């Protein structure tokens, strides 16, 4: 088994401080908070993704996404364990049915790399949170019985952690449900472990058109030659449509220049920029949050200089389970002391804390 094998990458993930220090030079802050942060949320990084990280520079944008910082140990008043209220809208273990016509199916608790701003920090890396095979059957029965569901989104953790056989089974069962219009997979493995995209996996994907895969690239440094090979394989052999959702992250991608490079490069690789998310208000995320007015200003500048194909929608998933809302200069009504007041498409108003 070689480094080009995804199972080798999984088996050789760096998960502890001592091993990490053999590969990179840690700042005093990074080392001091590592253990305390790991008590709340696991650390893991693949050798591949580690190779993208600057081993000596604490301001490296890859490094900032994966190494704990002191701000992660601070819990602000507006931060929640489950900011999107997924547990409240969970009729069956692993299934979040928050929107009428679509449901998220959480089928893996494992990620190759654990992002420090993860919305699901409360459950990712915890085996007890993953549905077992009997609970898979219960979820499939739920999807069959709820004819209003037009889309099922496989998520996690990372759903591509599952074996090819299990992925084939789940996609086959879901595709056989008449009222399901299409399927979507959310995965960060094309970013953190592109060797997961094998010929055999793409052969499975090709059987289930239309299949949409949403990747999670946040910085142009992540778009490597290895990624280009994997993405080309997904499109040409897997017959999938590729979209990308980024998170707007302070000191990672919060400039016009970085977002321009990221989104043009995504389109060149064959991936449509889909969403730019305002960082969710999950506990420990304050160090990543870009003020919404700065995000709006960025989008205003981007729309004036970039092709429409390269421009994502800037959105906020409302804390408390209110769903996604579009953020933009045309919809901001008022900035208050601790929140923004927006108007949405149907004339209703909503408030977003900052």
Where in this protein do the model-derived segments appear?
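Short, flexible loop/turn elements at secondary-structure junctions
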Residues: 109-111, 158, 189, 219, ...
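Conserved, mostly hydrophobic/aromatic
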Residues: 49, 115, 274
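Short, charged beta->alpha transition segments
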Residues: 90-93, 103-106, 137-142
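Flexible, acidic/Gly-rich N-terminal and inter-domain linker regions that tether
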Residues: 1-97
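C-terminal accessory regions of radical SAM enzymes
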Residues: 44, 297-354
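Conserved AdoMet/S-adenosylmethionine-binding subsite of the radical SAM
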Residues: 137-147, 151, 160-306
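Canonical Radical SAM [4Fe-4S] cluster-binding loop centered on the CxxxCxxC motif
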Residues: 97-134, 185
